[in-house]
Regions:
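Conserved histidines in hydrophobic membrane contexts and catalytic metal-binding motifs
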Residues: 1-241
Length: 241
């Protein structure tokens, strides 16, 4: 049958290989790259220092507001798993309130019980100094999201803090909680670029469920199957000689 002839499978294998070969190379090369650096280095975690712990003596000395006062002020429902955390933010003790269902976190001054607003650019840079081994040079508040950005998946606004080293390093700081949201370096950007090639999502860089990836995955399977069938047919032909 001509449709199932060796010539047909040879041509099918050749054309399928031509179509998917570049993407197969991208999958292999990016997979090799992903296996080399430690993922913690990609995320910049090696630059983080230990988070300062709450000093009990400091709490007693500064006479902080009782947690029951914050519970009443923020109208917290403990039965709904809403929480109050005592933390440091830019050198000050704060209460961080997390409501349920998830809303924007609320911050209260632990000394006065008053609600607090965003940290300043100077405070954002001081947090980078305190929480990392990096030296900040500038801080800018980001309010607008951008498809495929370095800070995608994180709530805005964020402070974008530029540091001296590593070169082109950026630290993103949450202006509400004062926490380090992300650290981005050239290594992370290389990883992110190759990740977009790997999953074939060149804009958002996070979506596995898109037609292009499915198409080339299916073509890759067909290429392998056609090669196996071609090998099988070739073996039968040679054995018949």
């Amino acid at each position: 049958m001509k449709f199932l002839s060796t010539t047909f499978f040879r041509k099918a294998h050749r054309w399928l290989g031509l179509i998917v070969s570049i993407q197969l190379l991208m999958w292999t090369a990016s997979g090799l790259f992903f296996s080399i650096p430690d993922i913690t280095d990609v995320r910049g975690e090696q630059y983080l220092t230990q988070t300062p712990s709450i000093n009990i003596n400091q709490m007693a000395r500064e006479n902080i507001v009782s947690i029951s006062t914050i519970i009443d002020t923020a109208k917290i429902n403990l039965e709904a798993s809403e929480t109050v955390l005592l933390k440091h933010r830019a050198g000050r003790l704060i209460y961080q309130v997390e409501k349920n269902p998830p809303e924007k976190k609320l911050i209260f001054d632990a000394l006065t019980g008053q609600p607090m607003t965003y940290i300043t650019p100077t405070e954002a840079m001081s947090i980078v100094v305190d929480r990392t081994e990096l030296s900040p040079t500038d801080a800018v508040l980001i309010n607008q999201s951008k498809t495929g950005s370095e800070f995608r998946g994180r709530d805005l606004p964020l402070y974008k803090v530029t540091v001296t080293k590593p070169k082109k390093g950026i630290v993103y700081v949450d202006p509400v909680t004062g926490e380090i949201a992300a650290i981005r370096t050239k290594l992370w950007r290389a990883w992110d670029f190759l990740w977009s090639l790997h999953i074939m999502d060149y804009q958002e860089r996070d979506d596995f469920s898109q037609w292009l990836l499915r198409l080339f995955s299916a073509l890759g399977v067909l290429t392998v199957l056609s090669g196996i069938i071609l090998w099988f047919y070739s073996g039968k032909v040679q054995s018949g000689k």
